[in-house]
């Protein structure tokens, strides 16, 4: 498998992994169900995971629909959603001190390289001269 099909599969795998791992990791007694967390913090934890799942679902739908069909606007939206979501992992510790930790940076760093490769593989290409 080469080119666009490989990129579609790669973006699907990354998106599915990000969505599922967020639910598995955050819906635990150490995070959203942590009794030490105030209810408002638990609510924001839930919102963060819900947004991640929806963004990753949108990436998959865009990839296999309009991006696969070669529509440039869809590729731009896909790039904005996926790279924007990844950027949040690196920007959050700067904006909210004390929120950065090595596992979060590693999670984002590990997903960034294959995301860039997938985005490049599904990029719109000019046809003809």
Language-model features: where?
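Short juxtamembrane and helix-loop transition motifs at transmembrane-helix boundaries
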Residues: 34-43, 65-73
